A protein has these predicted regions:
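Acyl-thioester C-C bond-transforming condensing/cleaving domain
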Residues: 1-6, 18-47, 64-65, 69-143
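Short polar catalytic/cofactor-binding loops
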Residues: 11-15
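Short glycine-rich phosphate-binding loop at a beta-alpha junction
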Residues: 49-56, 113
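Glycine-rich phosphate-binding loops at beta-strand->alpha-helix junctions
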Residues: 57-63
Length: 143
């Protein structure tokens, strides 16, 4: 089997910021959509369907169970563009690049978008079972 070369043509990102800073109200989906729209504008992809969009996320909120698909639907890309998420402890953006590069090398895709999205301001917080029960009880209190 002959493999093809996969090359990075360009990129786009939102600037780094501290948690609770300028992106405090933005979800990971908001940030990924902004990065996708910047990429679309930079490379003239409005309305285009690429072969696949893949993004990784470490701090995935439960409402972002389909983060990349929702970001594609909210972006200027063609809504029929296939999209999926990758999730592992770290380096998910790099894993997305490897995943899409392998698809290109094997002839399964021509053009892919790969990246990552996380928002430390919107990270899901895990609390003890005792605190969880207390918070649920308080939420049912009549005011």
């Amino acid at each position: 089997m002959t493999t093809r070369s996969a090359v990075v043509v360009g990129g786009n990102r939102v600037p780094f910021a501290k948690a609770g800073g300028p992106y405090a109200a933005a979800s990971a989906q908001d940030l990924l959509t902004a990065a996708l729209d910047g990429l679309v504008a930079r490379f003239g992809l409005a309305g285009s369907q690429v072969d696949e969009v893949v993004a990784g996320a470490v701090l995935k909120h439960s409402r972002d169970f389909n983060l990349t698909r929702e970001a594609v639907l909210a972006s200027a890309l063609d809504p029929h563009t296939p999209a999926c998420d990758l999730q592992q402890a770290c380096a998910t953006g790099v894993e997305a690049v490897i995943y899409t590069a392998n698809k290109i090398r094997l002839g399964q895709a021509e053009v892919c978008v790969a990246g990552g999205a996380d928002s430390a301001s919107d990270a899901p917080l895990v609390v003890s079972e005792r605190l969880r029960r207390a918070l649920l009880k308080a939420s049912r209190a009549v005011t």
